[in-house]
Regions:
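Short helix-capping segments at alpha-helix termini
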Residues: 91-95, 140-142, 260-266, 328, ...
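Acidic, low-complexity intrinsically disordered segments
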Residues: 2-227, 231-234
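Non-cysteine beta-strand/loop elements that form the S-adenosyl-L-methionine
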Residues: 62-64, 126, 282-301, 364-372
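Radical SAM [4Fe-4S] cluster-binding motif and immediate context
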Residues: 170-333, 338, 353
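Catalytic cores of alpha/beta
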Residues: 109-115, 342-356
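Hydrophobic/aromatic residues located in beta-strands of well-ordered beta-sheets
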Residues: 4, 36, 98, 146-147, ...
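Radical SAM enzyme core and accessory elements
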Residues: 2-7, 35, 49-58, 95, ...
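Flexible glycine/acidic-rich beta-alpha junction loops that bind and position SAM and/or redox cofactors
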Residues: 13-14, 66-70, 110, 199, ...
Length: 468
């Protein structure tokens, strides 16, 4: 049986390491016909050269999850690390074809192929396209007819891989395919309940990676996966990693209901809750299922900016959502994205007025300044029209949009002024807690028996520092 080595490139550990769920799902799709091994840079003693030498792969897949941290001020690009730490060593260690994939790759396929001197790549979902690519190479066929396959200077006739049937995908089973120890203490086990997004946010690259239609897994399948993982790992937290958890309406409710029906005792959290779809009944179901916290990503609380960003909810709906989660005592992290098209000081102050009036002071508010420009988005079209970028210019290396009505310096000045008086508001450039703060938080949680979300413990420390 031929061998495939799948290499993860996300080695960031702050604020906590992120497990390579995408690689594990591709591995599951490959395993019936291939001998597969995953290299996880977060594993103890991870040694790429030793793994390549011992495994002697026939093909190597390099997963590229992120391009950068999408932080305008003091942000970090991952391009050089991916190339120097993974792609170049792989080229030196093995003659096996190097194939790129992942969300970060799919946004900039030709740029990454050139940077990494790779042979092929898969744009979009890899569970079907990657095995098809390998089969074509084994048979000596040209793989460029496979949707989503790209090579330096060449692309298939269909840019992205055909969307897979998510209800037929095998479970990722991360803990069976890699050492889960690095993720157990701070991270949460990732669960994906659907793919695709039907929303039209101006800046977002999700639809071009996963498609513009929701493809939902049956609630029973989602909860089967949770139950199986809990049976293997015991007391482990789970995080739903969909772009938005409660879209489309009814899907999140069905999952929560299924968890409750089975009597599972689990700890849950989720990356995104859409204010357009929040009801008291949903939050009650989520609390009953085991949610200890949620995230909400409205991006703005200005009616003008909600329209400019093409959000699918109104200020009134956002206010109602904030009222519902506060009355339900559901800990919530809020995320706002300031500086988009048409942003002014007045619209920024509208967002902070919402924070003051509706957000629980015990909840953390994450403020991002400027918006990362990605190709093939409405924001890209605006950026070209306003001469932020030139048509066809590569955006692999970080470029950010800031409303011309403000400018970068004025935006940073306003946000700095407003966050300085609000201890629960954290700028994106300051959002990763330093190691000493994380250690202090861990000490407090242990000594005081705190069973609150970590962000609330960190806020306790921030308040103490600001008043000291």
């Amino acid at each position: 049986m031929k061998k495939v080595l799948l290499v993860g490139s996300n080695s960031l550990r702050a604020p906590y390491p992120v497990s390579p769920v995408g690689l594990c799902m591709v591995a599951a799709a490959l395993e019936p016909g291939w001998q597969v091994r995953i290299f996880d840079p977060n594993a103890a003693g991870a040694d790429l050269a030793a793994v390549v030498g011992a495994f002697a792969p026939d093909y190597v897949g390099l997963g590229i999850c992120n391009v950068d941290d999408v932080v305008m001020e003091d942000g970090v690009s991952f391009v050089n690390e991916v190339c120097e730490r993974y792609a170049k060593p792989l080229r030196a260690l093995t003659q096996a074809p190097l194939i790129l994939g992942g969300a970060g790759f799919s946004i900039f396929p030709q740029e990454w192929l050139e940077e990494c001197a790779a042979d092929y790549g898969v744009v979009g979902e890899g569970e079907a396209a990657f095995p098809a690519l390998l089969a074509a190479l084994e048979a000596g066929r040209d793989p460029m007819a496979i949707p989503g396959v790209v090579a330096p200077g060449r692309a298939s006739t269909q840019r992205a891989a055909r969307p897979v049937l998510v209800d037929l995908l095998p479970f990722a089973a991360l803990d069976e395919r890699l050492d889960y120890a690095p993720y157990r203490e701070r991270g949460a086990y990732p669960i994906q309940t659907k793919r695709g997004c039907a929303r039209r946010c101006v800046y977002c690259s999700y639809p071009q990676i996963e498609g513009r239609a929701f493809r939902c897994r049956p609630a029973e399948s989602v909860v089967d996966e949770i139950q199986q993982v809990q049976g293997r790992l015991g007391d482990v937290a789970f995080e739903f990693v969909d772009s938005v958890f409660n879209d489309p309406p009814g899907h999140a409710e069905a999952i929560c209901w299924e968890i409750a029906q089975r009597g599972l005792k689990v700890r849950l959290r989720t990356m995104g809750v859409n204010p357009a779809e929040v009801t008291p009944e949903l939050i009650e179901l989520m609390a009953g299922a085991g949610f200890a916290q949620i995230d909400s990503t409205p991006d703005s609380a200005s009616p003008k900016m909600l329209e400019n960003l093409r959000k699918n909810f109104t200020l009134a709906q956002l206010q109602r959502t904030a009222t519902i989660v506060r009355e339900a005592k559901m800990p919530t992290m809020w995320f706002f994205l300031l500086g988009g098209p048409g942003e002014t000081e007045e619209t920024i102050l509208e967002t902070f007025a919402f924070i003051d009036q509706f957000v629980d002071p015990e909840d953390m508010v994450h403020i991002s300044e400027g918006i990362r420009i990605f190709p093939r988005t409405a924001l890209y079209d605006t950026a070209v029209r306003e001469r932020f970028v030139e048509p066809g210019e590569s955006l692999l290396h970080r470029r950010f949009y800031v409303s011309p009505e403000l400018g970068r310096d004025r935006l940073l000045q306003i946000v700095g002024r407003e966050t300085a008086t609000r201890p629960n508001c954290v700028r994106s450039s300051e959002s990763t807690p330093p190691p000493a703060m994380l250690q202090e938080a861990a000490r407090l949680r242990k000594e005081q028996g705190l069973n609150e979300p970590m962000f609330r413990t960190l806020l306790r420390i921030r308040r103490g520092q600001s008043s000291g």
